[in-house]
Amino acid sequence: MKQHTLAEAIAHTGVGLHSGVSTHVRILPADAGSGRYFVRVDLPDSPTIPAQVAVVSQTVLSTQLGGGETGVRTVEHLLAALAGMGVDNARIEIDGPEIPLLDGSAQEWVTSIAEVGLVAQAVTNNLASFDIQEPIWIHQDDAFVAAIPASETRFSYGIDFDLPAIGNQWYSWSLTTEPDTSFAQEIAPARTFGLLHQIEYLQKSGLIKGGSLDNALICGPDGWVNPPLRFANEPVRHKILDLVGDLSLLGYFPRAHFLAYKASHNLHIQLAQRILALSN
């Protein structure tokens, strides 16, 4: 398979979910073999942070790459958009600590990528041929993530909440011969969601400073606070979006069936770390 990069640069500005800080992100074409990487253009010497499993620094309600003042937080939606649309190489310039949440989904990123299109590059992505040979299972209480041998790359997710509006949901999505179209229609529009009874606690914990009814679905005991939903099962589709973004830190998607149930960014990253160890 050939590698691909953007045909032209794209950009978005918005507020970060947890920091509440407004940042500007510009994504530029990058050389074949360079991968996806972030550049903190607001800092001296513009430090570079590769979008790789090895540099994950924390996974509390989002995934952060790099530590201290040079890190970049909440990278999962943007990385899912790039990976889901087939962008192997990209220079991601950001002037702050957190990727803008935008509308809470990956839809705006995907729309911009589709508008400029991709350019094929000479380097072949040999890593994309790596297959999972034996099942991998990681458990944490009743939650789990897994990767099992399969004839295609597929993502399946389950969630279970006491709130009737969410309840138990399952969804399965696979990379197809036209993954950009499938991802753009089935996964990218799904927005992040939160639970009404947790908001005050999270805010007191210094989180979700940039959260609002414009960038997150909120669910309470009486239903959704800010309907309508884009899909009846939008919450579980968003969990697949998160999983795709976190596993994209491998730099490729092995041929496997990825399964997750009531999982978290932490479990997603543990799975990616296990796969990376096996591939080496």
Swiss-Prot record:
One of its GO terms (molecular function) is UDP-3-O-acyl-N-acetylglucosamine deacetylase activity. Transmembrane segments: none annotated. The keyword Zinc applies. This is UDP-3-O-acyl-N-acetylglucosamine deacetylase. It holds the Pfam family LpxC. GO terms for biological process: lipid A biosynthetic process. Its cofactor is Zn(2+). Pathway: Glycolipid biosynthesis; lipid IV(A) biosynthesis; lipid IV(A) from (3R)-3-hydroxytetradecanoyl-[acyl-carrier-protein] and UDP-N-acetyl-alpha-D-glucosamine: step 2/6. It comes from the Bacteria. It catalyses: a UDP-3-O-[(3R)-3-hydroxyacyl]-N-acetyl-alpha-D-glucosamine + H2O = a UDP-3-O-[(3R)-3-hydroxyacyl]-alpha-D-glucosamine + acetate. Zn(2+) binds at H77, H238, D242. SUPFAM superfamilies: Ribosomal protein S5 domain 2-like (SSF54211). Keywords: Hydrolase, Lipid A biosynthesis, Lipid biosynthesis, Lipid metabolism, Metal-binding, Zinc. Catalyzes the hydrolysis of UDP-3-O-myristoyl-N-acetylglucosamine to form UDP-3-O-myristoylglucosamine and acetate, the committed step in lipid A biosynthesis. Belongs to the LpxC family. Gene3D superfamilies: lpxc deacetylase, domain 1, lpxc deacetylase, domain 2. It comes from Nostoc sp. (strain PCC 7120 / SAG 25.82 / UTEX 2576). Its EC number is 3.5.1.108. The active site is at H265 (proton donor). The keyword Lipid metabolism applies. The lineage of its organism: Bacteria, Bacillati, Cyanobacteriota, Cyanophyceae, Nostocales. GO terms for cellular component: membrane. Coiled coil: none annotated.
